């Protein structure tokens, strides 16, 4: 009698079947043509133009910030060119009452959420006023510890739910951040309590210089949502419409009490990781850069709007000049901001200083008065 064949669980097939379901969602192709009519968001012509204006303005801000950094007039700076659709189209899907918990590359989102540009410059300089956001700007200071913002976002979203607020908390990290323990802890907590959170992974292919292929065996980062039981979606991060629609749907789910969503945006940063000495030519090829430049989010969205008769060179030049004027005024205001002192730092840290610090405070106060 022939032996009975032993059945197998075939866990590999289950994995492959699961990973194959995460296909990148796209609405606009590289030439600005609509390839998925059913998913085109319900945005007015005025809103489409406004989103483009923000993207152009932010590209100029990035160029000027790099220049200001090289002049020694800005401190820490993480370039954003290439990621405008991923950053700004997602922010555009938010409401004023929503909270943004940014990473250090995500300053543009909080600027468009209400943070004055001057304060963004002061944050870069390490001035304490750059961390004192005005009342009504629902955002935390950019998180420097990679991935830590995911835990904070879970907490903020949970608080919004407990308080009965019709709002969400959204956060951003890069592909490298999704390899951090805080990433999993944050999405797991938010999932367990159905907190109104949106978790965005801006997959720009490199964690500083480490390619995504050396960070994880997962075919997509969106599929990491499955482990905690929440929806995950991968979208073309160079496609403003796709990013907007994915974020809008995630927000609708969240405020309806259906819990968080994980969004992976496939994007690319054209510049270095930060201006602190990173040289991308050591780990990226010029051919790779050229391929991604063909997918430029501004070029793509510009073509889309031009085809609709909503955009032209004159309009773009107006935005560019306005951006330059805004930046010039903001950096001048930052230059004229009173320099921080030891006593000013102590004053904002304590309402009632311990005796030993109060004594030190008086010593520094006397020194600073001379």
UniProtKB/Swiss-Prot annotation:
Gene for this chain: pdhA
Pfam families the record matches: E1_dh (PF00676)
Key words, A-Z: Oxidoreductase, Pyruvate, Thiamine pyrophosphate
Organism: Staphylococcus aureus (strain MRSA252)
This protein's name: Pyruvate dehydrogenase E1 component subunit alpha
Subunit structure: Heterodimer of an alpha and a beta chain.
GO molecular function, one term: pyruvate dehydrogenase (acetyl-transferring) activity
Catalytic reaction(s) noted: N(6)-[(R)-lipoyl]-L-lysyl-[protein] + pyruvate + H(+) = N(6)-[(R)-S(8)-acetyldihydrolipoyl]-L-lysyl-[protein] + CO2
Biological process per Gene Ontology, one example term: branched-chain amino acid catabolic process
Function: The pyruvate dehydrogenase complex catalyzes the overall conversion of pyruvate to acetyl-CoA and CO(2). It contains multiple copies of three enzymatic components: pyruvate dehydrogenase (E1), dihydrolipoamide acetyltransferase (E2) and lipoamide dehydrogenase (E3).
Species classification: Bacteria, Bacillati, Bacillota, Bacilli, Bacillales
CDD domains linked to this entry: TPP_E1_PDC_ADC_BCADC (cd02000)
